[in-house]
Amino acid sequence: MKAYTYSSVALAVTISLLAGCGGGSGSSNTPPVVTTPTTPTTPVTTEPEWEAGVYEPQSQYLAKCETPRSGIDPFTNRAYPDTQGTAMDEKLWLRTWTNDTYLWYDEVDDNDPANFSVLGYFDQLKTNELTPSGTPKDNFHFSQDTAEYNELSQSGISSGYGFDWEFGSTTVPRVLTVRFTEPGSPAATAGVPRGATLSRINGVDFVNDNTQQGVNAINAALFPEDAGTVTSFEFVQVDGSTLSVDITSGDISVTPVQNAKVLDTENGKTGYFQFNTFIVTAQEGLIDAFDMFVEENVTELVIDLRYNGGGRLALASQLSYMIAGPNQTNNATFETLRFNDKNPNTNPVTGETIRPTPFYRNVIDYNAGQLTDTFLP
């Protein structure tokens, strides 16, 4: 039995993953330090040309990379499809892809890609319109390195120190606060508490240093390229005291489901857990939590989603089934994806016909892409 809808589309359907040429590192939550914009390189004669309002087929630029990957993709066991191209090929693919698949494609400014780096160009390929409440219509526009995404979403591994940060201000005076640390991570082992704010890193004033040298040093320290990098952090804790620690970066095992417990209240037993991300490895933790809730006969449930950034829709369907149960979900639709008016019936990412997603009541073998015969609690 095939589980036909569990792509890595985040819960907000405006999120997109950049898989072409390995993607990049960027986010709607900008890095803690704003860097000087990249100066565009001088185009070479072999580059394709941009023409305002003219969109060539995606296939003309697909997998043409300025720096092609080679060898076998460890997550697909297939050869990388990359061929030699240019930065302009990458940017024009992003442009055409956005025009074909983006929900608000007709609200995207068609700016000359020669004026941007690849990631800088993608960052502005979105609507700038606001909702009636004044918030950005698209609040989930970001790119991510493909290998990093696959490692996190499929294996639950993320590189770094184990911090989950709250980006308060990315310009001076900067504010970067620890929301929580991953259990067993270097950050947790160092005893850095929730609510601590970063004040210095490797001796650099994180809050106020606005020199280019300082900016570069801060970004390099916060986002080390290699595991085993030792970084000196200085934090101001909630009580005003200072905490100085040296932390070594590594491959962090992400725990999506944390702090599952049963609380005795005046209304009876209440189940609680913190749920941070809808990735494949969350399935086991969710099942364990709900097995406990069933055994303890909880009558109320609290799910802490404050730090959840979305993830797989199939997991959201499974979680919803475990909350609502079979009587409320039998033969019901969990969700139906809606794309732009160019794609009313077909998913432009997968090429499959758009069909409603049910409430999945079974454990899913995500590696095989199959529903198993085992029922969820």
Predicted ranges, named:
Residues 17-20:
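C-terminal motif of bacterial Sec signal peptides marking the signal peptidase cleavage site
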Residues 13:
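A glycine-rich, hydrophobic loop/mini-helix early in the fold
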Residues 256, 310-377:
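Gly/Ser/Thr-rich loop/hinge elements
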Residues 1-9:
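Bacterial N-terminal signal peptides that target proteins for export
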Residues 25-32, 40-301, 307-309, 314-315, ...:
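Flexible, low-complexity junctional segments that flank or bridge functional domains
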Residues 9-10, 90:
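Alpha-helical structural motif
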